[in-house]
Regions:
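Serine-hydrolase catalytic core recognition
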Residues: 290, 423-730
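Asp-box/WD-like beta-propeller blade repeats and closely related beta-sheet repeat scaffolds
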Residues: 111-157, 163-197
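Blade-loop segments of beta-propeller domains
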Residues: 67-99, 104-106, 132-137, 324-327
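Beta-strand C-termini and the immediately following turn/loop, strongest in propeller blades
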Residues: 50-56, 62, 92-95, 99-111, ...
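Short loop/turn segments that connect beta-strands within beta-propeller blades
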Residues: 63-66, 121-125, 161-164, 262-266, ...
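Predominantly five- to eight-bladed beta-propeller fold
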Residues: 69, 104-109, 113-116, 170-198, ...
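Signature of short aromatic-glycine-proline-rich micro-motifs recurring in repeat-based ectodomains
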Residues: 36-40, 84-91, 183-202, 283-284, ...
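Non-catalytic accessory segments flanking enzyme active sites
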Residues: 36-41, 47-48, 52-60, 70-71, ...
Length: 730
């Protein structure tokens, strides 16, 4: 009887398991398991936010309960003859009476794009084109809401609403691959992470902008083919060429100057901003004072950030702060730089961990607003009257982040309620915030919360549909772990095991990593893994693999000392740590030590190649997607931040994937887009030649007309099928 009962239970379990859904690569790449998101913009009243619904409606909602208060724009209810079908982006005017609405968006580079923009009157429900000319880039309302400035073809334009939307051209020297006004060049956009390089002053009497003279920057070009998705019929017979300015390590950068335009007198001036030879201007921004804008500068070594207060009318610039941080200033310093009513707030690692500081607009010693062993991740808001500052920081572990408020006396209160990774968008008065929470097992949950105590007021989105979809799949277990290398370094990792894991079996392992400076893959967040939720890793687990990710030396979340020890030798320590991970895994009783593979994308591809040629032959196979192979071929700003120039650091540059080609061990697959504007095809071309001359076998797949993301049409599904099959052949 007992035997019959056990047999019945076993058959029932087998039947249930066989009925459960399976993950497929096509479903993963087509977005079947992509979580819903909430993108909101806080409105001026401090009580409401706006958001875009279904790509055609802009609504105003309450921060208290999330309910819709009014519809600001509906594409189906526009009056007049001008109509649009979709909303790609929108910008509400300062007085919240008009909206700039974008349609027909066209991507330019990773962060930039252009489109057809319209001015929408909320009161009249009418649309009017922002310009009758070609597509516009980066439109910006003036503080009084009566003007809009934008960029087109490298020049700045100004539209005045009070003069029947009259358009005037502010600059006239913009020229492809020579001069850009009001928007960054390629390397500034990519590495300083911004797309608009102009601003109005506080009373809207002056327009200020950055001018990029890239005429002496070396050009780079690559071929464009007809292709299929999207088809370029103009290249049916002969391929075309895309050429742009790309400064590689040690080469010339654009000469950047800052200018002002007096809107009434139409006088243009050049600001007397001191910039070191070949130095940088990562940001300009307005203050609440009409006679003051702020300009940030950096030296070429990027170990000094200077803050200047500039008068756009007199052109005088006064130094108010210099932040010296060795060996380099992290890019988050200017990402989180914020002008507030009584000065500015910035993030610095001067104490060894990233913390927030306040400085008067008139200068003086900066005052620390936060402190502690765990780094601040992001700055959200500041209440000057109460002295409260709102931010996220690591929460007792590099893996987790929480939202905090710190008062004027330094007392810190955690606002977020759940352990994992929390991010926030605060109302303009910081009374409320939208909290995005997830952990490695749970898709994002978006809640509206009280800004004083973090109490959840309502849930906007909990991704219940996705959770239900995933509940029908037999997923493997995900677990965090730490281990210590033979060099005495403790590293963090996560591991995904098959759902039917048997400790008595030996499993092949696929290691995924990125490993770049300041980056993190090992986080208690749904963002973990290559496709979020470790879902691609779960798919591999279904196929019988254990999947592992370890953050080695140089990665983020553990303070400046841990992060910056790879300085001047990118790839050396990172590769050692990935090899150490493989050696540790090989000692585990459930791992097949002869079948350990590694892969990564971009920097992760570089680290894959460096690890497979580190000298200890531990990897049976590897896949490098869009890899850098020598940092001589990568851009100035990123590379020199971590490596200085090739002339200053010849030994650091000399140790690269190409020079290590003779030591390659394991079966290698390289995947590369032919139209990658970021990591150029040249990287794999030069590496392939080195492998051929070293008589090393390898396989390579080129993706026609694909950029660094290698996507479009069936491309992603094909790519991940090749990666999967490659590891199946270990």
């Amino acid at each position: 009887m007992l035997t019959r009962t056990l047999l019945s239970a076993l058959l029932s379990l087998m039947a249930t398991t066989s009925l459960m859904a399976q993950l497929t690569i096509k479903d993963l790449t087509d977005g079947k398991y992509r979580p819903e998101s909430e993108n909101v913009e806080a409105m001026a009243d401090g009580e409401s936010f706006s958001r875009l619904e279904e790509g055609k409606r802009i609504v105003r909602c309450s921060f208290k309960d999330g309910k819709t208060l009014e519809t600001l724009f509906d594409a189906d209810n526009v009056r007049g003859r001008v109509k649009i079908k979709e909303v790609c982006d929108y910008i509400i005017s300062p007085k919240e009476d008009n909206i700039l609405i974008e349609t027909e968006h066209q991507q330019i580079y990773r962060r930039s794009g252009k489109g057809k923009w319209y001015i929408y009157s909320i009161k009249n429900k009418t649309l009017a084109p922002l310009s009758d000319g070609d597509a516009q880039e980066q439109p910006l309302w003036s503080p009084d809401g009566y003007m809009v400035a934008f960029v087109r073809d490298g020049d700045l334009f100004l539209v005045k609403l009070l003069f029947n939307n009259s358009e005037s051209q502010i600059t006239k020297d913009g020229e492809l691959n020579k001069v850009i006004n009001g928007k960054p060049d390629w390397v500034y956009e990519e590495e300083f992470i911004f797309t608009r390089a102009f601003c109005f002053n506080a009373d809207a009497t002056m327009l200020c902008w950055m001018r990029f003279d890239e005429s002496e920057v070396p050009a780079y070009s690559f071929p464009l083919y007809k292709g299929l998705e999207t088809e370029r019929k103009e290249f049916l017979t002969y391929p075309g060429t895309f050429e742009y300015k790309y400064p590689m390590a040690g080469e010339r950068n654009s000469i950047v100057t800052v200018h002002s335009f007096d809107i009434k007198s139409r006088v243009t001036r050049k600001l007397s901003l001191p910039v070191e030879t070949d130095g940088y201007v990562p940001r300009i921004m307005p203050t609440s004072y009409p006679e003051k804008i702020v300009c940030l500068t950096q030296n070429r070594h990027q170990d000094q950030l200077s803050v200047y207060v500039c008068n756009p009318r007199s052109t005088e610039c006064r130094l108010v702060l210099t932040d010296d941080v060795k060996p380099y200033v992290s890019e988050t310093a200017y990402e989180d730089f914020r002008i507030v009513s009584d000065g500015f707030i910035y993030k610095s690692e001067r104490s060894g961990t990233a913390q927030l500081y306040h400085c008067s607009i008139n200068g003086g010693a900066p005052r620390a607003l936060t402190s502690g062993e765990w780094p601040v991740v992001e700055f959200y808001g500041y209440n000057a009257k109460e002295g409260n500052i709102y931010y996220s920081a690591k929460d007792g572990s590099p893996l987790r982040e929480a939202v905090f408020v710190c008062d004027s006396k330094g007392k810190v209160k955690k606002l977020s309620q759940r352990e994992g990774v929390n991010e926030a968008v605060f109302s303009t008065n910081c009374r409320y915030f939208l909290n995005k929470w997830s952990n490695i097992d749970t898709p994002p949950v978006f809640t509206l919360c009280d800004g004083s105590n973090g109490k959840v007021l309502t849930t906007l989105e909990d991704n219940s549909e996705l959770r239900n979809r995933l509940s029908s799949i037999r997923l493997g277990s995900k677990e965090f772990f730490t281990f210590t290398t033979t060099e005495g370094v403790t590293l963090n990792g996560w591991m995904v095991k098959p759902a039917d894991f048997n400790a008595g079996r030996k499993y092949p392992v696929v290691m995924f990593q990125y490993s770049g400076p300041g980056a993190q893959q090992v986080v208690d967040s749904w963002s973990a893994g290559n496709m979020g939720g470790c879902l691609y890793e779960e798919y591999l687990a279904e196929e019988g693999f254990i999947c592992v990710c370890v953050d080695g030396r140089g990665t983020g979340g553990r303070g400046a000392e841990f992060e910056k020890q790879t300085y001047q030798h990118l790839g050396y320590l990172e590769a050692r740590d990935q090899v150490e991970t493989a050696l540790w895994l090989a000692r585990q009783p459930y791992v097949d030590s002869k079948r350990i593979g590694i892969w990564g994308w971009s920097y992760g591809g570089y680290c894959t190649l460096m690890s497979m040629s580190e000298g200890r032959p531990v990897f049976a196979a590897g896949v490098a997607v869009a890899p850098v192979t020598s940092y001589r071929y990568y851009d100035t700003i990123y590379t020199e931040r971590f490596m200085r120039t090739p002339n200053e650091n010849p030994d650091g540059y000399a140790d690269n994937a190409i020079s290590r080609a003779t030591r390659l061990s394991g079966r290698l697959l390289i995947c590369q887009g032919t139209a990658d504007d970021n990591v150029h095809y040249r990287n794999v071309a030069e590496y392939a030649e080195a492998l051929i001359q070293a008589d090393k076998d390898f396989y390579q797949i080129d993706f026609t007309n694909r950029n660094h993301s290698i996507s479009g049409g069936n491309t992603r599904a094909f790519l991940f099928r090749q990666i999967t099959n490659w590891f199946k052949q270990m």
